[in-house]
Amino acid sequence: IYCSEYTRVALSDHKLNLSFYHGTPVSFMGEQINIVKENDIIPLFNQEKMVILETPGHNEGCLTFQLANYFFTGDALIPNIPIVTKLKSGNKQQAKESALKIKMATDENSIICPGHLNMIKSTEINWNIYINE
């Protein structure tokens, strides 16, 4: 598991990871957790690497993982849907800044891979939804 420090703590706390509120409390107790932060690089295979972008807003621990032109955003950015910031540790200003960070890191060849819905070209995103909030 590669995650932020906030997420490491949340994995073992069923209230912080919100599973308690869904009626299925889950607390991860494994030890194979790697804490990553902005600009960390995760070596993969065949010289491929994943670069970390800290993208808080949906929650304090959100990260985006960049692999070449693919951006795995999880809940930090779901294309063309406003970012949910009303949950524990959500922050509207950070969400706006994170959306702008993702936008600036992408180009016309970039693909956004969100945690929900389908992949989409970054050029098909209405960035004003996030930037002008």
Label each residue range with its predicted role.
Residues N17-F20, K49, E54, N59-N132:
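Metallo-beta-lactamase
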Residues I1-F45:
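Active-site HxH/HxHxD metal-binding segment of metal-dependent hydrolases
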